[in-house]
């Protein structure tokens, strides 16, 4: 069953394709515009590709008549469409990910094996993988090739790993009782190649000692629930009137819960 067949509820694929044309503003009524006709043909072809009909043939036909009823030149426009079989996604492969796990990358996909091929969702998946910022850019466009005689497709996403972590550190020395101070910062947005993030920040010196540790998981237990845990300890010393020191220790958590009735990517954040 496919939602674009003759038995499906709602408008047919052809009706929706024609609707794309009618929504576009064009030249004055009754005036033929070759550029807009070509654009309309491209949109019809795109509509078929997004429903899996990548082998469909859309041939624009322009028939010129010498004169119409009002003695004006007239053209008749139509498309000759051969739909053929829709393409089903047979297999999806990931290549070149020497460090990042397949599971991490596949979570970015809007298509899965068994789906009817959809060009827009393929493009969205490709962009989502690039937005991870774990791979060199520009990211090659996915390879598609026939999988069998029925015209089903195998899709391959190719990536090339790049360095993602960072380490920052520094030190300073001051006189008049200030002493030695410094900072260390470590951040890895692709911890263990699992798309999890870990960061550590430490500022230290005679009068201050701040420590912060954060861990983020975008898919807790392989679910669509994300989470962040942070722990911190802050110590400040005062040398005015023997005020002593102030120490604060704490932690925070945040959960991102999916809201599927709004959209697949929408989440609701809950913090404590």
What are these regions (language model features)?
Residues 10-19, 57, 99, 115-272:
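Gram-negative/organellar outer-membrane beta-barrel architecture
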Residues 1-132, 136-154, 159, 164, ...:
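Interaction-mediating elements
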